[in-house]
Every structure is written in C-alpha cells, then in structure tokens.
Amino acid sequence: PASVALSAVTVTVNGTNVTSAFAADPEGNHQLEGVVTGLPLGKSKLVARAAGPGKSRRHRDSLTLTNHDIQGPMFSGPRQVPFVCATPNNAAGLGLPPIAQSETCETATVVSFRYRSTTNQWLDYDPASPPAPSTIQQVTTLDGETVPLIIRWERGVINRFMYSIAMLSPASQGPAPDFSAWNGKLLYSFSGGVAIGHTQGAASSGDMLHLAGLGLGYAVIYSSGTRTNTHYNLQLGGETAIMVKDRFVSAYAEPEYTVGVGGSGGAIQQYVYGQNHPGLLDAGVPQYSYPDMVTQTIHVGDCELVERWLDSKVLADPLSPWRTWVNRTLVEGLNASAVIPNPYAPVMPYMPTPGSSECINGWRGLSP
C-alpha cells in the first residue's frame, strides 16, 4: 500500500531474509523489484512484511515460488523414454565435449567466438591470435553502427535439448557478454520438419547463427527442442522456448522485445506459442506457413497414412482399383494424374509410371 514505505518492507524466502536482493522500481512505481537466486528445487515460500509500527505491521503477503530443474519438465508431463543424446558423439558439431552423460543429456556449457570471413564462412576466432581485420566481414546494425562480424556463441543443454545463444561481440571476447553492438532486441530462431521425438535432435548451424539477424545486431536464441524435425510435441516445445528465453534474460539482459522467425513447423510454433504463452514472443515472422491450421494440417496428418493404406491394397491385389491413379482422388479428395512424374517411382514398382497424386507430391515423406 502507498501508506507503507518501501524501506519498511522485509522479504524472506523460506525464513531467510533476502530483502537486500530487492530495490525500488526504477520507473517510480510504489513497488520493489529483485531477483532471488539459490532457490532449492521445488516449492519455496516468499513472504513480504511491513516492518513499521502500528497498523502497518499487519501488512503481509506471500507467494509460492516453484523452482524447476534446468532439464525440466515444468508442465509438459513425464519425460519421453527412450531418449538418445546427440552431444556425446558431437553429431551436431557444437563443440560440446564428447563425454558420457546423464539421462537428461546434460553437459557443460561452452562459450566460444566465431567470425564471418570475407569468403562467407564462419571460422573460429581466437582472441589470443586474432585474424587480420581485413579478413573479417563488416556489418551495419539497426543502430547504424558498423562493426566486424565477430560473435559470442554459447551452447549447452536445456530441457534435454541443445540450445544456442549468439550475439555480436566486436569490442571484447572475454567471459562476460559484450553488449556494445547489441541492438537490445532478441530473435528466436524456430525450425520446421516432422519427427516423433525420442532424441535430442540435431542442431542447424544456419538457424543458430542467423546471419541476417546477427548482422543487424539482434541476439539470436535457438534450441533443437523448438525444431519440429526433432519432435512435434508443442507443449514440450513451448516449455523449452520459455526456458531458453529465461536463460537469455537471466544470463544476459531483458530484451526490448522478442521476435520469432522460422518456416513451416517453425511458423506453426510461433502461432501456437504466441497463443499459449503470452509474453514469450512480442512479434513473429512465420514463413511459408499454412493459411489456416484447421484445414491444412489434415493433409499433413492424413496424406502419408492414406497413401500407405492404398499402397497396401495394391500390393495385396495387383488388380486393385487403387492401382489407377485417378481413383485415389475418391478417397483423398486431392488431384491425381496418370501423366505427372512420381518422385517415389523407384520405390513404388507396383504402381504405373508416370503417375502421381497431390498427396505424394506435396506431403509424402514428411512423416517419420
């Protein structure tokens, strides 16, 4: 209440005084702000009390805080098993140590530096023996500052998936982030594809090191857990996105805004996470996305299954009506033709060639 001086408020967590972690709101609101670290896993009770005399002593409020393990889960449910870790053999080329790991695929966080060469390659940058400045590309950020394209690149594991944080680092290449060329904005790079999980996945260097975004001064975050080519559990993906962004906010800074970017499954994630987790994304750039989620995902889910069923009928009976391409339209509701080439003809010798269906040309091979 306005009647209580902020200096009279005491804050405790599980009975321990943490008042020193809080300060007055810099925007002038009558409230305290702060970050409490070192919480145990599970639930903790935060209590705020007014320490002044008289009635102000009656002012007391509490909040239950739940601290989750960095490998989750928070709300996505039991972990999927079996689950294959990809970092022990360094399959993703992340530079993570190839060591035996726990069932959560946890490994040490790695920070290194790279630069974009004038030959359009990402190369390792050694601060102790830097390359000649003339071999490093120059970029101009949104703020109009021209700097060498040198980046700080953090990789590790969050929620069992590989994550990446990259940002320009032209002024220094030390342990602490260099904010000199950061435009204050965050880009979340989402990826598409289709998969059923059970693996940590593979990371995309193109998505992790989003060249256009980095060159403009954005910080770029990424996770193999927000790549639908790893899994299509959007509860798990949303949870992972929250945790990866929280890592950036905690270890770097609060961005002015966060914008998503990505195509196909990367676009769908932006729609769903924007709907389910307000505040995670402030804007999105969904690319080659579906015009609507209700009618278009029918083909994604059904085409592969229907085509396989029709194929099974032809394999069982070479005289099956489903060996005639145009008949498949009766079931699928999509075009079929006896003159269009079939990209899968080598593995479909039981079907006449040429000939194909819209289901095959558009969606076959998409499902795992």
Explain the meaning of each model-derived region:
Residues 2-368:
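C-terminal His-loop and adjacent cap/lid subdomain of alpha/beta-hydrolase
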